[in-house]
Amino acid sequence: MIELDRLSKRFGPVTALDDLSFTVRPGHVTGFLGPNGAGKTTTMKIILGLDAPSAGTALVNGRRYDRLVRPLHQVGSLLDATALHGGRTARLHLTSIARSNGIGRRRVGEVLRLTGMEAVADRRVNGYSLGMKQRLGLAVALLGDPPVLMLDEPVNGLDTEGIGWIRQFFKALAAEGRTVLVSSHLMSEMALTADHLIVIGRGKLLADMPTAQLIAANARHDVLLRSPRAAELAGLLTARGATVTPQPDGALVVTGLDAAAIGDLAATRGIALHALVPRQASLEDAYLDLTGESVDYHGTR
């Protein structure tokens, strides 16, 4: 379990984290989301003892990281997949870390197999793709068989097969009762991977809830329809309390009534429908609605 209590971090006049509190519980894949500069990496570094908070506490299994006994056996992390000695092989890299942490050589072979790196384990790291380096970083995180895993953008550089594999792998780790915290900018992948989400913006907590609940609470749902009597139907729908937005191509976008109610109303008036499409909001829609005011830099067209 990871517990943050009123965590704050200031860099001179800049407040990177502002009274941030949340708990990451075992048995779940928890997505950690926020715009660039929101404070995600700073939060992870403080949890791992790589930076000190200005105020508040960050605990792993009830203790600060610097007070954990055999920390690699308590929490595994991947913050930067490129932070590797390019002249070493994956096997040598893992063996060196294992030896310094009292971990046997057998475990090195196990994590190489778990992460699909066994066939390239004796190649030098400087010949690896980013996706291969991500797998090696994950192997390091797993060396101590820890109950807590923290991973910063772990799918960067992975191909489609690799992303699907890591999604199922994280779910399997959570099903074993581990605490899994994953940050990512890929909303479509987070929607498939994480069953709980923590969202921060400008160092403050914006949301802490199950994925489906966050989508339902922060995104709009609508129905797209087409009809040769669109103007007439729009008037009927508005009279029923719906909001109707005509589109340039003649379609109507309706909120406030579901597809079944719209279809029933059209049928009672003998109005033909050429299309009636319920549109489910995505995690990306919900995320953009939630974090819109926390983005520091907006593009223009």
Where are these regions (language model features)?
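Short alpha-helix boundary/capping motifs
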Residues: N101-R105, I163, S227, G256, ...
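ABC transporter nucleotide-binding domains
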Residues: I2, R6-G201
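C-terminal coupling/interaction segments
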Residues: T255-R301
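ABC transporter nucleotide-binding domain
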Residues: I166-V253, L257
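Residues that scaffold the ATP/ADP-binding catalytic core of kinase and kinase-like folds
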Residues: L68, A141, L214, A286, ...
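Conserved NTP-handling cores and scaffolds of large molecular machines
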Residues: N101, N218, G241, Q280, ...
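Short alpha-helical
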Residues: D66, H85, I103, S188, ...
